[in-house]
Amino acid sequence: MRPSRRAPDELRAVSLERGVVKYAEGSCLVKFGDTHVLVTATLEERLPPWLKGQGRGWVTAEYGMLPRATLERTRREAAAGKQNGRTVEIQRLIGRSLRAIVDLQALGERQITVDCDVLQADGGTRTASITGAWVALADCLGWMKTRNMIKGTVLRDNVAAISCGIYNGTPVLDLDYAEDSEAETDANFVMTGDGRIIEVQGTAEKTPFSQDEFLALMALAQKGVTRLVDLQKMAVA
């Protein structure tokens, strides 16, 4: 039995609320159960120096957690003077995931910066961030399209992410913190709307996992991503 009493293939309650920030070109408040992330997408008429003159744009991401997003206060990284390795890893993952489904040529010579700020953390902050980031990005691109700043299709597909793990010997979908901290194996899957894989991160926390167990986790992830993509489409409709 899972601590949350969910079925092995059951997501937490998921919500994606678009257009929640007045000033941002795109935004989304994403909730995976008690994990809440505010995502904004900002259009910037500038590019990294190494991209200038190439006729294409860029999508990048930043990620951070509010001090009381966690049970005990976490010191702000700005106060510490540097980002920790986990933060850098996650924001690079978010950026890679979004660029995989964006036509950077169609975007033109401009940059969209996606900021993911964790308001409350209960496991799966990176997967929630990626899923909400797609909605915020779509919101931003819609804003641009209404102003004739872009033409054609910039977003080539959806992208969503979900965690899976082996908890008490059973493959389960969408781990919360209680499960993640006790799981024998945990993995994150980033997938497109048509089921292609962008990235897989998997770790055996206690004992190695078999190929069959990995395939069971991937099947769960595909089911979860399909549901998340449906929710994304509803959010931007």
Swiss-Prot record:
Question: SUPFAM superfamilies, alphabetically?
Answer: Ribonuclease PH domain 2-like, Ribosomal protein S5 domain 2-like
Annotated catalysed reactions: tRNA(n+1) + phosphate = tRNA(n) + a ribonucleoside 5'-diphosphate
What is the top-level taxon of the source organism? Bacteria
Biological process terms in GO annotation: rRNA catabolic process; rRNA processing; tRNA processing
Q: What class of enzyme is it?
A: transferase
Q: Which cysteines are joined by disulfide bonds?
A: none
The protein's UniProt keywords, in alphabetical order, are:
Nucleotidyltransferase, RNA-binding, rRNA processing, Transferase, tRNA processing, tRNA-binding
Q: Per UniProt, where does phosphate bind?
A: 86, 124-126
| Matching CDD domains | RNase_PH_bact (cd11362)
Pfam families xrefs: RNase_PH, RNase_PH_C
Q: Does the keyword Lipid biosynthesis apply?
A: no
Q: Name one GO molecular function term.
A: 3'-5'-RNA exonuclease activity
User: DNA damage: is it a keyword of this entry?
Assistant: no
Listed EC numbers: 2.7.7.56
Assembly and interaction partners: Homohexameric ring arranged as a trimer of dimers.
Matches recorded under HAMAP family: RNase_PH
* Role this protein plays: Phosphorolytic 3'-5' exoribonuclease that plays an important role in tRNA 3'-end maturation. Removes nucleotide residues following the 3'-CCA terminus of tRNAs; can also add nucleotides to the ends of RNA molecules by using nucleoside diphosphates as substrates, but this may not be physiologically important. Probably plays a role in initiation of 16S rRNA degradation (leading to ribosome degradation) during starvation.
Report the family membership. Belongs to the RNase PH family.
- Protein name as it appears in the record: Ribonuclease PH
What is the source species? Answer: Rhodopseudomonas palustris (strain BisB5)
Gene name of the encoded protein: rph
